[in-house]
Amino acid sequence: PMVTGDIKDGSLGFDYKWNMGWMHDFLEYVKRDPYFRKYNHNRLTFGMTYAYSEKFILVLSHDEVVHLKCSMLGKMPGEYEDKFANLKVAYTFMMGHPGKKLLFMGQDFGQWSEWSEKRSLDWYLLGEPEHKGLWAYFKALLHIYRKYPACYALDQYPEGFFWINADDGDRSIYSFVRCSEDGKDNLLFVCNFTPVARPDYMVGVPQAGKYTLILDSSMKGQHIYTAVHTECDRQPYAVKYPLPAYGTAVFKFSKHTAKATKKAKKHK
């Protein structure tokens, strides 16, 4: 504790702290067979109980892809294609979660081998469709992160995040909202960590109106959905969306009823 706070308050005064607890829970969850993930559902929700105690970096460093720990792609369960789908949904959850991000080189396109300082990355893998697809998807995630301040502006403030459904362990689906400072272009994230498609999936939303799908795991482009007045996930409205196996969805919307009112303070 007190690593990144103000020195006047007895803190060490660092800008950020690696969130090793989150890293451990995250990796323990994503490497499990999807059938057993429902028994470990709280591993991905627990981090929010202390997310504002420090200024955190969500870190997947070189130390997690060496010494027989496997690369990120190698950690994923399932057959060949399942591993890529698992990694996409894992990275989506990570990019939506409060905290700055650190991902070691080569993990964005699915390096198979562990990292070694004695050789270069396996760039030739980008010539294979699955690796190129993973790289393109991660690039799209980075584009969203850079374009929409909701992803980062209120990282250190509770006003910047709220769960839609943190308790859907039986289906291993997580949904949450990242809020902007002015209530514009808030982002709704949905992550399905199982190989089970949910064609009639409904996610609760805080208000009526349009919800624009700006990214999903199929990479089919934007689509606008209209919320219906049906209570879902303890929210007054809902959006129906055909959630694929290992599916992800990121929607943008504005002026939600619980928009952030507290401005982020400048770090001194």
What are these regions (language model features)?
Residues P1-P77, E81-F84, K88-V89, G96:
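Glycan-recognition surfaces
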Residues R37-Y39, D63, L68-K69, G78-L103, ...:
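Carbohydrate-interacting/catalytic domains
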